[in-house]
Amino acid sequence: MREQEYRVPRAHGPKVAVIGGGHGLSNMLRGLKQYTENISAIVTVADDGGGSGMLRQDLGMPPPGDIRSCMEALANTEPVMRELLHYRFTEGSLAGHSFGNLFLAALNGISPSFDAAVRRMSQVLAITGRVLPVTTADVQLEAEFENGATVVGESKIFYCKKQEDCRIRQVRLIPS
């Protein structure tokens, strides 16, 4: 059975496209949702730390965390569903993983592609607008610092910048 193409019904308000990731983007989406239904969130998939990094490595899928956060921000669901998406396990082998990330990982496992999994989760959550991964390729962030050092991996870049107190000269996406 071929999955139907994801179409956003005509919505009210100005058309807004946002690009980013992390807590900042999801917080902005919560605010934008109050003013327009025409939101396209283009979300980073370069995270390599925490639970997203583990799912990325173990399951060979794009990191789900930033995508999940954006869908959670745009969701039109019952409060218990928001609570579930945000829930983090505290014990055992799932400690640190969020239910929302695992839910998206499970959808990825039963879908033909990560894009299809994102569309399915968007439908389940009845999100306002749409959430799109910035790329479907497996990519890493690479940063070149003023001192000449080059670091690969979002989590390592943050750590190196904090430890070295050195400014980043250039950032680029590289295929993994």
Residue ranges and their predicted role:
Residues G21, T44-D47:
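Cofactor-binding loop segments of dinucleotide-utilizing enzymes, especially the Rossmann-like FAD-
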Residues E3, R169-S176:
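Glycine-rich oxoanion-binding loops at beta->alpha junctions
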Residues A46-R172:
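Electropositive, gly/pro-rich neighborhoods at or near active sites that engage anionic ligands
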Residues M1-V16, R30-K33, E37, A41, ...:
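Non-transmembrane, aqueous-exposed alpha-helical and coiled segments at domain scale
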Residues A17, H23, S40, R120, ...:
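Functionally constrained cores in energy, signaling, and assembly domains
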Residues K15-G20, L104:
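Short glycine-rich or small-residue beta-strand-to-loop segments that form or flank ligand, phosphate
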Residues G24-L29:
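Short glycine/serine/threonine-rich phosphate/pyrophosphate-binding segments
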